Amino acid sequence: MKLSLNETRVIGVLIEKEVTTPDQYPMSLNALTNACNQKTNREPVLNLSETEVQESLDALAKQGLVVESRVGNRIPKYKHRFCNSEFGELQFTKQELAIVCTLFLRGAQTPGELRTRTNRLCTFADVQETEKVLQGLIDHSRGSYVVKLEREPGKRESRYAHLFSGDAATTVAQIPATTNTSTPAQSNSPQNNAELLERVEMLELTVEELQNQINKLVEQLGG
């Protein structure tokens, strides 16, 4: 399996919305496109057209990873068959799937970031538990699904990336460059960084909830 950036974004959104907004799942093309292009909880932020999303859906359908669901004459909606299906090869625990989904949506991340950002999909007791699940995805019996990247200069933690887009070199090539604008004092203040990260995450979740409500209203008015 070798998925493009757009394809991992589509699958990541479908996995996310299946858990967080089950009443809006399966998803229409319009709702899926809006969710793919969210400015919160997405890295990199994309600006995909409905045509591009449809092309990704078609490519994923050929691989058996997405199916169309249509009732009567209503607009088609889509759901993933990425894993945990009856005849599928991929079988993940709730925690494993949450990590893969979040890596699809936000690129390479540290265990601490993953623990915080998966909180709507699953629960991790602490960072150590997150690291244990990541190691399980690296040592998986069917092959590695995740890779631990080399620690960046000035960073305290290594980041992890998924391998569903190819080998480590391909994965790294898709990761947006990061810059460190913090002063040394700020960098050496984990407590302040953690508090700031938590506040940002809460704001992002609030914005996402509002966007979900808007999408639901649009669906109702359009249907």
Swiss-Prot record:
UniProt superkingdom: Bacteria
One Pfam entry name: DUF480
Family assignment from sequence similarity: Belongs to the UPF0502 family.
HAMAP family the record matches: UPF0502 (MF_01584)
PANTHER family linked: UPF0502 PROTEIN YCEH
Name of the protein in its database record: UPF0502 protein Sde_2426
Organism for this UniProt entry: Saccharophagus degradans (strain 2-40 / ATCC 43961 / DSM 17024)
Lineage: Bacteria, Pseudomonadati, Pseudomonadota, Gammaproteobacteria, Cellvibrionales
